Structures are given as C-alpha cells and as structure tokens.
C-alpha cells in the first residue's frame, strides 16, 4: 500500500496543508514543536482511529476552529481509496471512504495499515501493563478490525459491571447478604463479561503466538544472537488449549473465587483488562533487569516483527512511522533498522537533523521541511 496524498485542515497546528508523497521514504525535518509528530499522528488516526497522545478529539482540532479534517489518497494493490476523518471539537467524528459515510468504525478500520515507532515505545518494556495491553490491542485491530468492536463491547461491559459492584459494595460491607435481584443482576453481567472476555483473550493469545517467533528472530539478528528473547502472554484468567468452552469455565471459576474481593473493592478484578505481556531475555525479565540498550533492542525487534506479521496477514506491506526514534538508537541499531526498511515499506520519518542519515538515504528520500505547521519540499543540500 502507498499513501499518495495527505490533506490536513485545522488539525493540531496545521491550518491547511496538502502533501503529495513522491518516494518510498519521506523525511520530515525541523525543530521541535513545529508539527512533525502531528503529521504522523494524522496517519496513525487513519490507520487505527486512535492517537497514542490523546483520547479527546477536541485536542486534535486547531485552537479557534470548530472542526478539523484529515483526508488521504491511498493506493492499494488492487484499489484506490480516498479516506476522510472529520473531527469536531464537540460531537462525534464522521468517517468517509470514497465520499461515502461509514456507519461503523469497523467499516473504516483496515483500509490503511501502519506501524508507529516513537521514543514513547520504550514504555512497552519498562512501563505499566496497560502500555503493553494497548500495544497488543492496536496490533490486533490492524490484523482483524472486528477486534476493535469486540474490545469496545468488553470495555463497556466492565464499566457497567463496575457501576453495579460499586453500588453493592456498601451493602456487602455492612454484612448484609445480596438480595435476589442484586444476585441476578450480577450473574447477568458475569455471563456477558465471560462471553466477551473469552473472545478477547483467545484473539490475544493467538496474535501473540504468531508475533513471538518473529520478534525472537528479529531480536537475534539485531543482538547478534547474544541473547534469546521470549515473549509470553500472561492472561489474568489462565487455561490450557484454545477451546472456548474451556476458557469460559476457567473465567467463571475465577469470578467465583474473586467474588468477595470484587464486592469489597467495588470493581472488576477478573478479565483481560488485567492481562500482562512478558518479555524475557534469556532467563531475565527485561522490564526490571534489562539495560536501556537491551530494552531498545527489544522494542526495535517488536516493531520489525509487527511489520512482518501485518504484511503476512493483509498481503501488503504496511506504512512505517518513525517519530524521532533515531535519536534513541545507537549507530548500530540505526543501521539495523534502516537496512530492514530499505524500500520495502513506505516510511515517514521525523528528525531534527538530516545528518543522522547517510548520503544514500538522503538522496533517495523525499525531504519535507516542517515549520510552524507548514510544509516545504527541500533538497538535502538546503538543510543542515
């Protein structure tokens, strides 16, 4: 797939800009806070309908504007599509494909696929478990857009169940037994939690099982085979096999075991929203004992594995978005990354200095100077 054009209106600090991409590699160069990351964020939204920087659309709209717009012309192997996201400071966003409005987000997801790698991704290793869950969920959404719908339903069920548990907590703490109506309501939400949670965890397990060997292979290449990376899925509800009935039963049993704790805390403590993903180098947990260099190598291996897996599943190479990541990698890891990319993936890269790239890369790339939300195509000799 190839992103041919991108149009931004009242998006972040862009008043109105359009760019036509003319090479497999585009380098966005400029000082900090000029809009380089904002452009990559727009592409990320087209791919996932989410931003890793905010969950509020009003923060995406230019100050003083009521709404903003992202439009793109995408060339795929057998089709061409015009994608459009209308963002509103207040109210729901509108999604269009070829000027036809999408009734569901599910219809829009999967049109464009992209993998983003930024300095924030180091939190994949050293951050809290929700960082790793969000990373895995974003990947699974691109592999199977239906997953976003299932996850959204699961999160809604957890929210409603939490509200019920919170209302029952005071009654439980006074020593009163739950009434028949309360017990029936909780049982109803239990069934929905188990049903949707089972669909989520089985997809997570299968997705990670496909990604893990790819990550291990890439890690071996980058590290020179000095360490072995093991990626493990550590679900809150454990089971053996892939039979949904087995997962169902394990889920119900753990809910029964944790009933008192849930009533005491007034919140749901069982389910995939408590899952973890583990990264182990040889026999050592990377999160607690890995050096900064080891952690960067691990994240780089994960990102290259994502690219490989998405390409295998969808049959086309996804876009690669590199947000100021070269500054976080030493020269050896930079070389490994740039060699892996070559011209196989359309790549958008942000940087403050072109000197981080060798001459061959600069000569073959489209270079855009970014200044205060304005784009200008430049030659390498005109910068740095």
From Swiss-Prot:
Gene Ontology terms describing biological process: DNA replication; DNA synthesis involved in DNA repair; double-strand break repair; SOS response
CC per GO annotation: cytoplasm
Domain of life: Bacteria
InterPro entries: DNA-binding_RecF (IPR001238), DNA-binding_RecF_CS (IPR018078), P-loop_NTPase (IPR027417), RecF/RecN/SMC_N (IPR003395), RecF_2 (IPR042174)
A GO MF label: ATP binding
SUPFAM superfamilies: P-loop containing nucleoside triphosphate hydrolases
Coiled-coil regions listed: none
Subcellular location: Cytoplasm
Binding site for ATP: 30-37
Chief localisation class: cytoplasm
Keyword terms, alphabetized: ATP-binding, Cytoplasm, DNA replication, DNA-binding, Nucleotide-binding
Family the UniProt entry places it in: Belongs to the RecF family.
Note: This bacterium is considerably more resistant to UV and gamma irradiation than E.coli; the E.coli-like SOS regulon model is not an appropriate model for DNA repair in this cyanobacterium.
Function: The RecF protein is involved in DNA metabolism; it is required for DNA replication. RecF binds preferentially to single-stranded, linear DNA. It also seems to bind ATP.
PANTHER family (UniProt xref): DNA REPLICATION AND REPAIR PROTEIN RECF
Protein name: DNA replication and repair protein RecF
Organism: Synechocystis sp. (strain ATCC 27184 / PCC 6803 / Kazusa)
Gene name linked to the record: recF
